[in-house]
Design a protein with these regions (language model features):
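Basic amphipathic alpha-helical segments that dock to polyanions
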Residues: 7, 27, 37-54
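Short amphipathic alpha-helical interface segments
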Residues: 2-20
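Mid-protein regulatory/catalytic core that forms ligand/cofactor-binding pockets
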Residues: 79-146
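Short acidic, hydrophobic short linear motifs in intrinsically disordered regions
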Residues: 17-30
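Amphipathic alpha-helical interaction segments
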Residues: 18, 49-52, 100
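Short, cationic-aromatic polyanion-contact patches
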Residues: 1-5, 23, 53-77, 120
Length: 146
């Protein structure tokens, strides 16, 4: 297995286990590689749009659907608290973990708190809409804004 694949899997496993982003050092330990090699793997994964990194080039901002930073899109699966990058990704966390969960967020227009149970088959029917200001083809122009 390539170092890039090992790195990606180590990152996602850490997020799944803890709900938090791993440090560069933790990933290096998990893949039994030196920090500089893992840093290079991060750069390649970023170029492939697998990761979004903070300006320091080593802190993980996003490993979709997981967010490396606290925000309004909270997902609880079992007893673990995760942050999603957006409303769309909040549905992806229970799917990625193959576990039911509860999404807590708020309506961007009204500020109304939102909470929804997500089962293994997806969310129940509801009247909510997901609206994104940026067309999907342009999301990666500025994925953090999107």
């Amino acid at each position: 297995m390539s170092l890039d694949t090992q790195t990606k899997l180590a990152i996602y496993r850490y997020f799944a286990e803890t709900g938090r982003r791993p440090s560069l050092q933790v990933v290096a330990e998990r893949v039994h590689a030196d920090v500089s090699s893992v840093r290079e793997a991060y750069a390649r994964l970023r170029a492939q749009r697998v990761l979004v990194l903070e300006p320091d080039g080593v802190s993980i901002r996003m490993a979709p659907p997981f967010s490396g930073v606290s925000n309004q899109h909270v997902v609880i699966v079992d007893e673990t608290k995760y942050f999603a990058n957006c409303a769309w990704d909040s549905f992806g966390i229970p799917a990625a973990l193959h576990r039911p969960g509860r999404v807590h967020s708020r309506c961007e227009q009204s500020g109304e708190p939102l909470s929804l149970e997500i089962g293994l088959e997806g969310p129940p029917p509801c009247s909510w809409l997901f609206h994104c200001l940026v067309p999907a083809a342009r999301w990666w122009d500025d994925i953090v804004f999107t």
